[in-house]
Amino acid sequence: MIFHVVTRQNWQKALQQGFYEADSLASEGFIHTSKANQVAGVLERYYPQHALLKGPCDLVLLHIDEIKLTAPLKFDMATSVNETFPHIYGRLNIDAVVKVEKL
């Protein structure tokens, strides 16, 4: 299982389109995702407002079954934190998302 943080609005748009494309797909060539043990760090580094809210916010966590992905999945080193992260090199097919968790 891999994970991706997204706004509810962007996830709703993906459901209407039938696929999900993060902005990073156009700018970097992939969609950023995380392993379970990396989610908290991602939230702290990239969504500090979430940590401050201590309550419901506009973010959801997608639980993605990597076996169901139709786009390639690769693990790349993020030198800024010295960890490898899973990256989806293409659109995220909606049926690969097995759970949507409110943050």
Q: What spans do the regions from the language model cover?
A:
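Conserved, structured core segments of small domains
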Residues: 1-103
